[in-house]
């Protein structure tokens, strides 16, 4: 399973995507869309609020950190697609509130 959580631990808000399955997910391509369906790459930092995202592999807990941005309504549609080492494609959509 892949899930996204909003966590506050004293260092600021963090949106964390974690792979808890036994499937390897080393090749992860994330695409996020705002509520108005405007897509933006994870490298884009033109929005007012940005949050770090941590991607953790379910097996060896390797982490990949990046930054995404959210809209002013504190809610956005998140869509991410990834492919594991066996070539299987996965996709998940979620509305994220923070």
Q: Which ranges hold each PLM region?
A:
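Amphipathic alpha-helical "stem/stalk" segments
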Residues: 1-98
